[in-house]
Protein backbone atom coordinates (compact mmCIF):
# COMPACT_ATOMS: atom_id res chain seq x y z
CA UNK A 1 0.00 0.00 0.00
CA UNK A 2 1.29 3.44 -0.90
CA UNK A 3 0.50 7.06 0.00
CA UNK A 4 0.42 9.31 -3.08
CA UNK A 5 -0.28 12.94 -3.99
CA UNK A 6 -2.16 14.42 -6.93
CA UNK A 7 1.13 14.84 -8.82
CA UNK A 8 1.53 11.04 -8.78
CA UNK A 9 -2.07 10.26 -9.72
CA UNK A 10 -1.36 9.76 -13.41
CA UNK A 11 1.63 7.44 -12.95
CA UNK A 12 0.28 5.48 -9.97
CA UNK A 13 -3.41 5.23 -10.92
CA UNK A 14 -4.02 6.02 -14.58
CA UNK A 15 -0.92 4.39 -16.05
CA UNK A 16 -2.55 0.97 -16.07
CA UNK A 17 -3.48 -2.03 -14.00
CA UNK A 18 -6.10 -2.46 -11.31
CA UNK A 19 -6.07 0.18 -8.58
CA UNK A 20 -8.19 1.15 -5.57
CA UNK A 21 -7.73 4.72 -4.28
CA UNK A 22 -8.75 5.80 -0.76
CA UNK A 23 -9.38 9.53 -0.22
CA UNK A 24 -9.16 10.10 3.55
CA UNK A 25 -9.17 13.03 5.98
CA UNK A 26 -7.93 13.79 9.48
CA UNK A 27 -10.38 14.00 12.42
CA UNK A 28 -12.64 11.64 10.46
CA UNK A 29 -13.81 8.58 12.45
CA UNK A 30 -15.21 6.81 9.36
CA UNK A 31 -11.78 7.24 7.73
CA UNK A 32 -10.08 5.75 10.77
CA UNK A 33 -12.55 2.86 10.75
CA UNK A 34 -11.97 2.01 7.09
CA UNK A 35 -8.16 2.20 7.37
CA UNK A 36 -7.58 -1.23 9.00
CA UNK A 37 -10.02 -2.84 6.54
CA UNK A 38 -8.14 -1.23 3.64
CA UNK A 39 -4.77 -2.35 5.00
CA UNK A 40 -5.96 -5.89 5.70
CA UNK A 41 -7.45 -6.29 2.24
CA UNK A 42 -4.27 -4.88 0.69
CA UNK A 43 -2.41 -7.86 2.15
CA UNK A 44 -5.02 -10.25 0.76
CA UNK A 45 -5.50 -8.73 -2.71
CA UNK A 46 -2.19 -6.86 -3.04
CA UNK A 47 -0.66 -9.20 -5.63
CA UNK A 48 -3.47 -8.43 -8.07
CA UNK A 49 -4.65 -4.92 -7.18
CA UNK A 50 -2.66 -1.83 -6.23
CA UNK A 51 -3.86 -0.09 -3.03
CA UNK A 52 -3.10 3.63 -2.75
CA UNK A 53 -4.20 6.39 -0.37
CA UNK A 54 -4.47 10.15 -0.82
CA UNK A 55 -4.89 12.85 1.84
CA UNK A 56 -7.97 14.71 0.69
CA UNK A 57 -7.24 17.98 2.50
CA UNK A 58 -3.94 18.44 0.65
CA UNK A 59 -5.29 17.28 -2.72
CA UNK A 60 -8.62 19.13 -2.85
CA UNK A 61 -8.45 20.06 -6.53
CA UNK A 62 -8.08 16.46 -7.73
CA UNK A 63 -10.67 15.24 -5.21
CA UNK A 64 -13.22 17.74 -6.51
CA UNK A 65 -12.35 16.87 -10.11
CA UNK A 66 -13.07 13.20 -9.35
CA UNK A 67 -16.35 14.08 -7.64
CA UNK A 68 -15.17 13.27 -4.12
CA UNK A 69 -17.54 15.08 -1.73
CA UNK A 70 -17.19 13.04 1.46
CA UNK A 71 -14.55 11.25 3.51
CA UNK A 72 -13.63 8.49 3.17
CA UNK A 73 -14.23 7.78 -0.52
CA UNK A 74 -12.92 4.70 -2.35
CA UNK A 75 -12.52 4.82 -6.13
CA UNK A 76 -11.71 1.79 -8.29
CA UNK A 77 -9.75 1.88 -11.57
CA UNK A 78 -8.97 -0.66 -14.28
CA UNK A 79 -6.37 0.35 -16.88
CA UNK A 80 -6.86 4.05 -16.17
CA UNK A 81 -10.66 3.97 -16.31
CA UNK A 82 -12.82 4.42 -13.21
CA UNK A 83 -15.00 1.32 -12.77
CA UNK A 84 -17.20 -0.41 -10.17
CA UNK A 85 -19.10 1.60 -7.57
CA UNK A 86 -17.81 4.55 -5.57
CA UNK A 87 -17.89 3.81 -1.83
CA UNK A 88 -18.27 6.60 0.74
CA UNK A 89 -18.90 7.14 4.45
CA UNK A 90 -19.29 4.16 6.78
CA UNK A 91 -17.86 1.60 4.37
CA UNK A 92 -18.26 -2.11 5.14
CA UNK A 93 -15.46 -4.59 4.54
CA UNK A 94 -17.87 -6.73 2.52
CA UNK A 95 -18.64 -3.78 0.23
CA UNK A 96 -14.95 -3.27 -0.50
CA UNK A 97 -14.53 -7.00 -1.18
CA UNK A 98 -17.47 -6.96 -3.58
CA UNK A 99 -15.90 -4.19 -5.65
CA UNK A 100 -12.43 -5.76 -5.54
CA UNK A 101 -13.86 -9.10 -6.69
CA UNK A 102 -15.50 -7.38 -9.66
CA UNK A 103 -12.03 -6.42 -10.93
CA UNK A 104 -10.73 -10.00 -10.99
CA UNK A 105 -11.50 -13.27 -12.81
CA UNK A 106 -13.80 -15.63 -10.90
CA UNK A 107 -11.13 -18.31 -10.50
CA UNK A 108 -8.67 -15.85 -9.00
CA UNK A 109 -11.31 -14.65 -6.53
CA UNK A 110 -11.85 -18.26 -5.41
CA UNK A 111 -8.11 -18.70 -4.88
CA UNK A 112 -7.96 -15.57 -2.71
CA UNK A 113 -10.99 -16.60 -0.65
CA UNK A 114 -9.39 -20.01 -0.03
CA UNK A 115 -6.59 -18.25 1.86
CA UNK A 116 -9.02 -17.15 4.59
CA UNK A 117 -9.20 -19.70 7.43
CA UNK A 118 -12.20 -19.76 9.86
CA UNK A 119 -11.47 -19.21 13.57
CA UNK A 120 -13.43 -19.64 16.83
CA UNK A 121 -12.86 -17.85 20.16
CA UNK A 122 -14.73 -17.89 23.49
CA UNK A 123 -15.29 -15.26 26.18
CA UNK A 124 -17.39 -14.74 29.29
CA UNK A 125 -19.06 -11.60 27.92
CA UNK A 126 -19.42 -10.21 24.42
CA UNK A 127 -20.28 -6.52 24.06
CA UNK A 128 -21.78 -5.37 20.76
CA UNK A 129 -20.96 -1.69 20.38
CA UNK A 130 -18.12 0.51 21.65
CA UNK A 131 -19.89 3.74 22.53
CA UNK A 132 -19.90 5.13 26.10
CA UNK A 133 -22.27 2.40 27.33
CA UNK A 134 -20.29 -0.47 25.84
CA UNK A 135 -16.93 0.98 26.88
CA UNK A 136 -18.10 1.49 30.46
CA UNK A 137 -19.45 -2.05 30.65
CA UNK A 138 -16.14 -3.33 29.30
CA UNK A 139 -14.21 -1.37 31.92
CA UNK A 140 -16.28 -2.59 34.87
CA UNK A 141 -16.24 -6.21 33.65
CA UNK A 142 -12.49 -6.11 33.11
CA UNK A 143 -11.93 -4.75 36.60
CA UNK A 144 -14.09 -7.62 37.89
CA UNK A 145 -11.76 -10.08 36.11
CA UNK A 146 -14.45 -11.11 33.62
CA UNK A 147 -13.03 -12.17 30.24
CA UNK A 148 -14.65 -9.69 27.86
CA UNK A 149 -14.54 -8.90 24.13
CA UNK A 150 -15.84 -5.65 22.67
CA UNK A 151 -16.99 -5.63 19.03
CA UNK A 152 -17.85 -2.65 16.84
CA UNK A 153 -18.28 -2.06 13.11
CA UNK A 154 -16.50 1.29 13.60
CA UNK A 155 -13.81 2.49 15.97
CA UNK A 156 -14.56 3.00 19.69
CA UNK A 157 -16.42 6.11 20.77
CA UNK A 158 -19.80 5.96 19.09
CA UNK A 159 -21.42 9.31 18.33
CA UNK A 160 -19.22 11.01 20.92
CA UNK A 161 -16.24 10.66 18.58
CA UNK A 162 -17.98 12.81 15.93
CA UNK A 163 -19.35 15.38 18.39
CA UNK A 164 -17.48 18.67 18.18
CA UNK A 165 -17.65 19.54 21.88
CA UNK A 166 -19.08 17.94 25.03
CA UNK A 167 -19.81 20.59 27.66
CA UNK A 168 -21.78 18.63 30.26
CA UNK A 169 -19.66 15.59 31.13
CA UNK A 170 -18.88 15.61 34.87
CA UNK A 171 -15.28 16.17 35.90
CA UNK A 172 -14.35 18.62 33.13
CA UNK A 173 -14.61 22.36 33.76
CA UNK A 174 -14.12 23.28 30.09
CA UNK A 175 -15.91 21.71 27.10
CA UNK A 176 -14.08 18.64 25.82
CA UNK A 177 -13.57 17.70 22.15
CA UNK A 178 -15.75 14.66 21.54
CA UNK A 179 -12.98 12.70 19.87
CA UNK A 180 -10.69 13.24 22.88
CA UNK A 181 -13.32 12.22 25.43
CA UNK A 182 -14.15 9.05 23.50
CA UNK A 183 -10.44 8.30 22.98
CA UNK A 184 -9.78 8.52 26.72
CA UNK A 185 -12.76 6.26 27.49
CA UNK A 186 -11.51 3.72 24.97
CA UNK A 187 -7.91 3.77 26.17
CA UNK A 188 -8.98 3.28 29.79
CA UNK A 189 -11.02 0.20 28.89
CA UNK A 190 -8.35 -1.19 26.57
CA UNK A 191 -5.51 -0.74 29.06
CA UNK A 192 -7.54 -2.63 31.65
CA UNK A 193 -7.41 -5.68 29.38
CA UNK A 194 -10.68 -5.80 27.45
CA UNK A 195 -10.16 -7.43 24.05
CA UNK A 196 -11.09 -5.20 21.09
CA UNK A 197 -12.38 -6.32 17.71
CA UNK A 198 -13.30 -3.06 16.02
CA UNK A 199 -13.74 -1.76 12.47
CA UNK A 200 -15.13 -5.18 11.54
CA UNK A 201 -18.21 -6.34 9.67
CA UNK A 202 -20.70 -8.15 11.87
CA UNK A 203 -21.86 -10.92 9.55
CA UNK A 204 -24.18 -12.83 11.88
CA UNK A 205 -25.68 -12.49 15.36
CA UNK A 206 -27.29 -15.46 17.13
CA UNK A 207 -28.59 -14.27 20.50
CA UNK A 208 -29.90 -17.70 21.51
CA UNK A 209 -26.50 -19.34 21.03
CA UNK A 210 -24.65 -16.22 22.27
CA UNK A 211 -22.62 -16.29 19.08
CA UNK A 212 -21.42 -13.57 16.70
CA UNK A 213 -19.58 -13.93 13.38
CA UNK A 214 -17.33 -11.08 12.22
CA UNK A 215 -15.79 -10.56 8.79
CA UNK A 216 -17.46 -13.81 7.65
CA UNK A 217 -14.74 -16.06 9.09
CA UNK A 218 -14.32 -15.40 12.83
CA UNK A 219 -16.88 -16.90 15.22
CA UNK A 220 -16.99 -15.43 18.75
CA UNK A 221 -18.95 -17.14 21.53
CA UNK A 222 -19.82 -15.95 25.04
CA UNK A 223 -21.89 -16.75 28.12
CA UNK A 224 -23.52 -13.31 28.13
CA UNK A 225 -24.11 -10.62 25.51
CA UNK A 226 -24.50 -6.87 26.05
CA UNK A 227 -26.13 -5.01 23.18
CA UNK A 228 -24.78 -1.46 22.98
CA UNK A 229 -25.34 -0.81 19.27
CA UNK A 230 -26.65 2.73 19.70
CA UNK A 231 -28.47 4.66 17.02
CA UNK A 232 -27.99 5.87 13.44
CA UNK A 233 -29.07 9.10 11.72
CA UNK A 234 -32.56 9.16 10.29
CA UNK A 235 -32.87 9.63 6.56
CA UNK A 236 -35.54 11.96 5.16
CA UNK A 237 -36.58 9.63 2.37
CA UNK A 238 -37.06 12.42 -0.17
CA UNK A 239 -36.07 12.21 -3.86
CA UNK A 240 -32.37 12.70 -4.48
CA UNK A 241 -31.20 12.05 -0.92
CA UNK A 242 -30.00 8.50 -1.50
CA UNK A 243 -28.29 9.38 -4.78
CA UNK A 244 -26.43 12.37 -3.29
CA UNK A 245 -25.49 10.79 0.05
CA UNK A 246 -21.74 11.24 0.35
CA UNK A 247 -21.80 13.31 -2.84
CA UNK A 248 -22.95 16.62 -1.42
CA UNK A 249 -25.26 15.43 1.36
CA UNK A 250 -23.50 14.68 4.65
CA UNK A 251 -24.54 13.47 8.10
CA UNK A 252 -21.22 14.23 9.83
CA UNK A 253 -20.07 17.82 10.37
CA UNK A 254 -16.84 16.73 12.05
CA UNK A 255 -15.94 14.75 8.92
CA UNK A 256 -16.93 17.18 6.17
CA UNK A 257 -17.42 20.76 7.44
CA UNK A 258 -13.77 21.60 6.82
CA UNK A 259 -14.31 21.24 3.06
CA UNK A 260 -16.87 24.04 2.92
CA UNK A 261 -14.56 26.96 3.63
CA UNK A 262 -16.13 30.19 2.30
CA UNK A 263 -18.98 28.17 0.78
CA UNK A 264 -22.73 28.08 1.35
CA UNK A 265 -24.48 25.12 2.96
CA UNK A 266 -27.97 24.05 4.02
CA UNK A 267 -28.55 22.39 7.41
CA UNK A 268 -31.71 20.33 7.95
CA UNK A 269 -33.04 19.93 11.52
CA UNK A 270 -33.75 21.80 14.73
CA UNK A 271 -32.69 19.66 17.69
CA UNK A 272 -29.49 19.84 19.72
CA UNK A 273 -27.38 18.13 17.06
CA UNK A 274 -28.59 20.36 14.22
CA UNK A 275 -28.16 23.59 16.18
CA UNK A 276 -24.76 22.73 17.67
CA UNK A 277 -23.38 21.35 14.40
CA UNK A 278 -24.64 24.38 12.44
CA UNK A 279 -22.64 26.59 14.78
CA UNK A 280 -19.57 24.40 14.20
CA UNK A 281 -20.03 24.43 10.40
CA UNK A 282 -20.19 28.25 10.51
CA UNK A 283 -16.50 28.26 11.44
CA UNK A 284 -15.84 27.28 7.84
CA UNK A 285 -18.88 28.14 5.67
CA UNK A 286 -19.66 31.71 4.62
CA UNK A 287 -23.44 31.24 4.84
CA UNK A 288 -25.78 28.66 6.36
CA UNK A 289 -29.50 28.26 5.76
CA UNK A 290 -31.24 26.15 8.39
CA UNK A 291 -34.48 24.37 7.47
CA UNK A 292 -36.74 23.23 10.33
CA UNK A 293 -40.26 21.84 10.15
CA UNK A 294 -41.50 23.48 13.37
CA UNK A 295 -41.88 27.13 14.41
CA UNK A 296 -39.15 26.89 17.06
CA UNK A 297 -36.00 24.88 17.75
CA UNK A 298 -36.13 22.00 20.22
CA UNK A 299 -32.45 22.41 21.14
CA UNK A 300 -31.38 23.56 24.61
CA UNK A 301 -31.55 27.26 25.44
CA UNK A 302 -27.79 27.85 25.49
CA UNK A 303 -27.35 26.34 22.02
CA UNK A 304 -30.32 28.32 20.65
CA UNK A 305 -29.06 31.63 21.98
CA UNK A 306 -25.61 31.05 20.51
CA UNK A 307 -27.14 30.19 17.14
CA UNK A 308 -29.39 33.27 17.01
CA UNK A 309 -26.35 35.48 17.58
CA UNK A 310 -24.50 33.96 14.61
CA UNK A 311 -24.64 36.38 11.64
CA UNK A 312 -23.81 33.62 9.14
CA UNK A 313 -26.97 31.63 9.87
CA UNK A 314 -30.39 32.23 8.30
CA UNK A 315 -33.38 30.17 9.48
CA UNK A 316 -36.44 28.90 7.62
CA UNK A 317 -38.96 27.74 10.20
CA UNK A 318 -41.98 25.61 9.25
CA UNK A 319 -40.32 24.36 6.06
CA UNK A 320 -39.51 20.83 4.92
CA UNK A 321 -37.24 19.49 2.16
CA UNK A 322 -39.09 17.96 -0.79
CA UNK A 323 -36.21 17.02 -3.10
CA UNK A 324 -32.48 17.29 -3.75
CA UNK A 325 -30.80 17.60 -7.14
CA UNK A 326 -27.37 18.37 -8.51
CA UNK A 327 -26.90 21.27 -10.90
CA UNK A 328 -23.27 21.46 -11.96
CA UNK A 329 -21.21 21.54 -8.77
CA UNK A 330 -24.14 22.81 -6.67
CA UNK A 331 -26.87 21.05 -4.69
CA UNK A 332 -30.42 22.37 -5.16
CA UNK A 333 -32.71 21.75 -2.18
CA UNK A 334 -36.40 22.28 -2.84
CA UNK A 335 -38.26 23.17 0.37
CA UNK A 336 -41.97 23.64 1.01
CA UNK A 337 -43.47 26.21 3.37
CA UNK A 338 -45.86 24.16 5.51
CA UNK A 339 -48.21 27.12 5.98
CA UNK A 340 -48.44 28.61 2.50
CA UNK A 341 -47.56 25.41 0.57
CA UNK A 342 -45.22 27.45 -1.63
CA UNK A 343 -41.97 25.84 -2.74
CA UNK A 344 -38.55 27.46 -2.83
CA UNK A 345 -35.25 26.26 -4.28
CA UNK A 346 -32.12 26.72 -2.19
CA UNK A 347 -28.84 26.50 -4.09
CA UNK A 348 -25.80 25.60 -2.01
CA UNK A 349 -22.45 23.84 -2.12
CA UNK A 350 -23.56 21.12 0.28
CA UNK A 351 -26.25 19.88 2.66
CA UNK A 352 -25.94 18.57 6.23
CA UNK A 353 -28.79 16.52 7.73
CA UNK A 354 -29.48 16.18 11.48
CA UNK A 355 -33.09 15.03 11.97
CA UNK A 356 -32.86 12.58 14.82
CA UNK A 357 -31.83 8.98 15.26
CA UNK A 358 -33.15 5.42 15.02
CA UNK A 359 -32.07 2.34 17.04
CA UNK A 360 -29.59 -0.08 15.46
CA UNK A 361 -31.54 -3.32 15.90
CA UNK A 362 -31.82 -4.70 12.35
CA UNK A 363 -29.98 -7.95 13.09
CA UNK A 364 -32.12 -8.89 16.10
CA UNK A 365 -35.36 -6.96 15.62
CA UNK A 366 -37.56 -10.07 15.92
CA UNK A 367 -35.68 -11.62 18.85
CA UNK A 368 -36.27 -9.08 21.63
CA UNK A 369 -39.17 -7.19 23.15
CA UNK A 370 -39.21 -3.61 21.81
CA UNK A 371 -41.19 -0.48 22.57
CA UNK A 372 -43.41 1.23 19.97
CA UNK A 373 -40.41 3.19 18.63
CA UNK A 374 -38.25 0.10 18.14
CA UNK A 375 -36.02 0.55 21.19
CA UNK A 376 -35.11 -2.48 23.34
CA UNK A 377 -37.01 -2.93 26.59
CA UNK A 378 -34.92 -3.77 29.67
CA UNK A 379 -35.42 -4.29 33.39
CA UNK A 380 -33.59 -2.36 36.13
CA UNK A 381 -30.47 -4.53 35.66
CA UNK A 382 -30.51 -3.94 31.88
CA UNK A 383 -31.71 -7.48 31.14
CA UNK A 384 -33.69 -7.88 27.91
CA UNK A 385 -36.53 -10.33 27.24
CA UNK A 386 -33.98 -12.99 26.24
CA UNK A 387 -32.05 -14.80 29.02
CA UNK A 388 -28.38 -13.88 29.14
CA UNK A 389 -28.79 -10.86 26.86
CA UNK A 390 -28.50 -7.32 28.21
CA UNK A 391 -28.79 -3.93 26.50
CA UNK A 392 -27.40 -0.49 27.37
CA UNK A 393 -27.10 3.02 26.00
CA UNK A 394 -29.13 4.79 23.34
CA UNK A 395 -30.52 1.55 21.89
CA UNK A 396 -32.72 0.88 24.93
CA UNK A 397 -36.18 2.23 25.73
CA UNK A 398 -35.84 5.23 28.06
CA UNK A 399 -36.81 8.87 28.35
CA UNK A 400 -33.39 10.51 28.06
CA UNK A 401 -30.37 9.61 25.94
CA UNK A 402 -27.14 11.25 27.03
CA UNK A 403 -23.49 10.21 27.38
CA UNK A 404 -23.98 10.06 31.14
CA UNK A 405 -27.09 7.88 30.93
CA UNK A 406 -25.26 5.45 28.63
CA UNK A 407 -22.37 5.28 31.09
CA UNK A 408 -24.84 4.55 33.90
CA UNK A 409 -26.50 1.78 31.84
CA UNK A 410 -23.14 0.15 31.14
CA UNK A 411 -22.20 0.29 34.81
CA UNK A 412 -25.44 -1.37 35.91
CA UNK A 413 -25.27 -4.16 33.32
CA UNK A 414 -21.62 -4.94 34.09
CA UNK A 415 -22.16 -5.15 37.85
CA UNK A 416 -25.23 -7.37 37.39
CA UNK A 417 -23.38 -9.71 35.02
CA UNK A 418 -20.24 -9.88 37.17
CA UNK A 419 -22.31 -10.87 40.21
CA UNK A 420 -24.18 -13.51 38.24
CA UNK A 421 -21.04 -15.04 36.70
CA UNK A 422 -19.15 -15.04 39.99
Model-predicted segments: where are they?
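Non-catalytic, surface beta->alpha helical segment in thiol-disulfide oxidoreductase systems
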Residues: 76-108
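Glycine-rich dinucleotide-binding loop and its adjacent helix/turn
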Residues: 109-118, 122, 231-284, 377-379
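Beta1-alpha1 glycine-rich phosphate/pyrophosphate-binding loop at the start
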Residues: 120-192, 275-301, 308, 316, ...
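Structural micro-motif
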Residues: 60, 66-75
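Thiol-based oxidoreductase modules, predominantly thioredoxin-like and allied folds used
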Residues: 3-4, 23, 35-42, 46-61
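A Rossmann-like FAD-binding core segment of flavoenzymes
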Residues: 182, 186-214, 219-222, 282-380, ...
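Short active-site neighborhood of thiol/selenol oxidoreductases, capturing the structured segment around
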Residues: 14-26
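FAD-site-proximal beta/loop scaffold in flavoenzymes
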Residues: 237, 242-259, 353-405, 409-412, ...
Amino acid sequence: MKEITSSEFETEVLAGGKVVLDFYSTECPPCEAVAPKFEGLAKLYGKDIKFVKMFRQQNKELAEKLGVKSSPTLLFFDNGVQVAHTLTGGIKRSDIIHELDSLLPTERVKEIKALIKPTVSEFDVLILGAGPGGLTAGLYLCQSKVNTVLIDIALPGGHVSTTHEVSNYPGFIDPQPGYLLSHNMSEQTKLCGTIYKVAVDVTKIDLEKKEVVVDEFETIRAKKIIIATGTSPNLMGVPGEKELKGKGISYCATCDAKYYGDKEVVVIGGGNSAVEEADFISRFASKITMVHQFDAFTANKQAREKLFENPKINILFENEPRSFAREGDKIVTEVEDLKTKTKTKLTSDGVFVFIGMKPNIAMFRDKLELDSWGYIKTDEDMRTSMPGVYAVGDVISKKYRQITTAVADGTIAAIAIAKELN
